[in-house]
């Protein structure tokens, strides 16, 4: 029986029972952090780390993934992140993901810690090498971007549709000039 630690074998073999997990918006200055978990029904071509794909390609793959998988997308608001803390939100997300999917599945989270949640393995940069984690990465990123595009209409000066709430120079300049809005994470260093 292969384990999740047999990474080279996982790269060459599709595991129908593997749930890939990733998040997007973890380091954003505003808006939600999205966590996604994905169990693919079949091997899909073109999947890789969402950060390496164009926005158009991510959106195309998003549609393919949701039609060919069992998935879960969770959102943690900036208020939840400020109140509970990022680690607690991540831990809660991992627990909800485990509860959503059956226990006989294997869980692989992109990163270096499972935050103490038993049964969840981790691998740094898994989103670049494991299809299910790549799929989760795409689901989380596209979901985060859609939310920020929607919220940008109510907060036009912050240009969330462009910066997706990350700490770009232009975003920080707007914060310095106009202050923060209700979407900003007050527990983060914003300037």
Swiss-Prot record:
<feature type="domain" description="RNase H type-2">
    <location>
        <begin position="16"/>
        <end position="191"/>
    </location>
</feature>
<comment type="similarity">
    <text>Belongs to the RNase HII family.</text>
</comment>
<dbReference type="Pfam" id="PF01351">
    <property type="entry name" value="RNase_HII"/>
</dbReference>
<dbReference type="GO" id="GO:0032299">
    <property type="term" value="C:ribonuclease H2 complex"/>
</dbReference>
<dbReference type="GO" id="GO:0004523">
    <property type="term" value="F:RNA-DNA hybrid ribonuclease activity"/>
</dbReference>
<protein>
    <recommendedName>
        <fullName>Ribonuclease HII</fullName>
        <ecNumber>3.1.26.4</ecNumber>
    </recommendedName>
</protein>
<keyword id="KW-0464">Manganese</keyword>
<dbReference type="InterPro" id="IPR012337">
    <property type="entry name" value="RNaseH-like_sf"/>
</dbReference>
<keyword id="KW-0963">Cytoplasm</keyword>
<comment type="function">
    <text>Endonuclease that specifically degrades the RNA of RNA-DNA hybrids.</text>
</comment>
<keyword id="KW-0378">Hydrolase</keyword>
<dbReference type="InterPro" id="IPR022898">
    <property type="entry name" value="RNase_HII"/>
</dbReference>
<feature type="binding site">
    <location>
        <position position="22"/>
    </location>
    <ligand>
        <name>a divalent metal cation</name>
    </ligand>
</feature>
<keyword id="KW-0479">Metal-binding</keyword>
<dbReference type="GO" id="GO:0030145">
    <property type="term" value="F:manganese ion binding"/>
</dbReference>
<dbReference type="InterPro" id="IPR036397">
    <property type="entry name" value="RNaseH_sf"/>
</dbReference>
<dbReference type="GO" id="GO:0003723">
    <property type="term" value="F:RNA binding"/>
</dbReference>
<feature type="binding site">
    <location>
        <position position="110"/>
    </location>
    <ligand>
        <name>a divalent metal cation</name>
    </ligand>
</feature>
<dbReference type="InterPro" id="IPR024567">
    <property type="entry name" value="RNase_HII/HIII_dom"/>
</dbReference>
<dbReference type="GO" id="GO:0005737">
    <property type="term" value="C:cytoplasm"/>
</dbReference>
<dbReference type="InterPro" id="IPR001352">
    <property type="entry name" value="RNase_HII/HIII"/>
</dbReference>
<keyword id="KW-0540">Nuclease</keyword>
<dbReference type="GO" id="GO:0006298">
    <property type="term" value="P:mismatch repair"/>
</dbReference>
<feature type="binding site">
    <location>
        <position position="23"/>
    </location>
    <ligand>
        <name>a divalent metal cation</name>
    </ligand>
</feature>
<dbReference type="GO" id="GO:0043137">
    <property type="term" value="P:DNA replication, removal of RNA primer"/>
</dbReference>
<keyword id="KW-0255">Endonuclease</keyword>
